[in-house]
Design a protein with these regions (language model features):
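Short N-terminal edge-element motif at the start of the domain
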Residues: 1-29
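Compact nucleic-acid interaction/catalytic patches
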Residues: 27-29, 38-82
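C-terminal terminal-subdomain/extension
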Residues: 61-193
């Protein structure tokens, strides 16, 4: 995964959000914008749902534009931008994600769609940081349960990093484990379980 790239999320991830008590109602394989990698946790990214403006009414678009001008947290909920066409970034519907839950790159005109406009990226990142700050003050405030989802993904990452050698199940590791247990017995040390 790369920052500022667009991806499709897996059904497994949508199911995970629901299992954790959150809501994610869009199963249409719309692209999500992979905005930034977490500053503290490697391989954890912050993604933002996107949608096409074509099916929005002029009244809905005007309402979103008005919200964008507000100084309150509502001003960070959405961003109207442009990639290969006008797009709505639903920033308040952001979520953490890992590579495990990406089903593929979002392809447009035969290539992986990547946002390259630095001004757009800056505005989106600022709004994302506002939403994440608000979430830190009010955990699970947003319908997708950002905090709970992040905690779950962090625990998955930690488990992957600390997989005991016994879990790797290869012939080489079986021999290594047997030798380790023999050495521990000779030294009178009880092997860890």
């Amino acid at each position: 995964m790369i920052e500022n790239g667009f991806y499709k999320i897996s059904e497994e991830f949508i199911d995970l959000i629901h299992q954790l008590g959150g809501k994610y109602s869009d199963r249409k394989e719309r692209p999500v914008f992979c905005c930034i990698e977490d500053s503290k946790i490697k391989n954890l990214y912050w993604a933002i749902q996107t949608s096409d403006l074509a099916h929005r009414t002029p009244a809905q678009i005007e309402k979103i534009k008005l919200w964008n001008e507000e100084k309150s947290i509502r001003g960070a909920y959405y961003h109207i931008g442009y990639t290969n066409r006008p797009a709505l970034y639903r920033i308040s519907n952001c979520f953490p994600i890992t590579r495990k839950y990406i089903s593929g790159e979002y392809i447009s005109q035969g290539i992986h769609l990547i946002l390259k406009n630095p001004k757009e990226i800056e505005v989106i990142q600022k709004k994302l940081h506002r939403i994440l700050f608000d979430e830190s003050l009010h955990p699970n405030k947003y319908e997708q349960h950002i905090t709970q989802l992040r905690e779950y993904l962090v625990s998955e990452i930690e488990c992957q990093r600390s997989v005991p050698i016994e879990m790797l199940k290869t012939p080489f590791n079986d021999v290594l484990i047997q030798k380790s247990q023999t050495i521990h017995r000779k030294k009178g040390i009880e092997p860890e379980r």
